[in-house]
Amino acid sequence: MKLAAMIKKMCPSDSELSIPAKNCYRMVILGSSKVGKTAIVSRFLTGRFEDAYTPTIEDFHRKFYSIRGEVYQLDILDTSGNHPFPAMRRLSILTGDVFILVFSLDNRDSFEEVQRLKQQILDTKSCLKNKTKENVDVPLVICGNKGDRDFYREVEQREIEQLVGDDPQRCAYFEISAKKNSSLDQMFRALFAMAKLPSEMSPDLHRKVSVQYCDVLHKKALRNKKLLRAGSGGGGDHGDAFGILAPFARRPSVHSDLMYIREKTSVGSQAKDKERCVIS
């Protein structure tokens, strides 16, 4: 408890950071069990790979960024491959802004699950489209993981291409290896570009800052914003982008998620700079 209090004192709360709603996003990782979802998340957050397998029920992470004079919040939701609660999966999809669908190249069942997941995402998001009367783009990448193994492939390239489609701005495919850290950076860059988010959110394009320096988020952002307004180009390179992994991040409550969805589905409702992220 003392450790938690110390870290809380060192790092401002989400409300103290005052991040505009337009700068808050959620990345959702979906797929069957044992395909490497958690390994991909671990690479994204820490750069490390854990070989031991531990079944995931649902893991929630939060990361803050200071990029080009702006502060961003990215929530990362690592979902269960067993989906014991369909309603929770639907809620995760409704609140997601960008998606990573993962299958194992040596497991056809996991590929067929990704086929179902992609359709479920499109169907679920179409509800928002029908209510808002606006186009709802769904930035989505499909990952064929475990490309480092010498195995017999159970999925043909033709099937993958058919699933992905011919519009790289809506869906892209990457053959990756979380174990070897192969093609992951390219995948994250493509996903953030698809979502029109700063490329510096990719783990290879920003500096990672320890939690005790959390207070520099706004100081650095304000400094860069002043430089940008002055036309000096401050904050324009990746050296001025950095991110902090929030300790003890908690998944927002169901009520908070439902309020967030309600806000998104309200006709003409758009995130404004004065609006703040929903804090559970």
UniProtKB/Swiss-Prot annotation:
Keywords: Cell membrane, Cytoplasm, GTP-binding, Lipoprotein, Membrane, Methylation, Nucleotide-binding, Nucleus, Prenylation, S-nitrosylation. GO terms for molecular function: GTP binding; GTPase activity. One of its GO terms (cellular component) is plasma membrane. A lipid is attached at residue 277 (S-farnesyl cysteine). It is a lipid-anchor. The keyword Membrane applies. GTP binds at residues 31-38, 78-82, 145-148. It is found in: Cell membrane; Cytoplasm, Perinuclear region; Nucleus. The modification Cysteine methyl ester is found at residue 277. It comes from the Eukaryota. InterPro entries: P-loop_NTPase (IPR027417), Small_GTP-bd (IPR005225), Small_GTPase (IPR001806), Small_GTPase_RasD (IPR052236). Coiled coil: none annotated. CDD domains: Rhes_like. A motif (Effector region) lies at residues 53-61. Expressed in brain, heart, kidney and liver. Residues 278-280 form a propeptide. SUPFAM superfamilies: P-loop containing nucleoside triphosphate hydrolases (SSF52540). GO terms for biological process: negative regulation of DNA-templated transcription; nitric oxide mediated signal transduction. Induction: By dexamethasone. NCBIfam families: small_GTP (TIGR00231). Small GTPase. Negatively regulates the transcription regulation activity of the APBB1/FE65-APP complex via its interaction with APBB1/FE65. Belongs to the small GTPase superfamily. RasD family. Component of a complex, at least composed of APBB1, RASD1/DEXRAS1 and APP. Interacts with APBB1/FE65. Forms a ternary complex with CAPON and NOS1. This is Dexamethasone-induced Ras-related protein 1. It comes from Mus musculus (Mouse). The lineage of its organism: Eukaryota, Metazoa, Chordata, Craniata, Vertebrata. The gene is Rasd1.
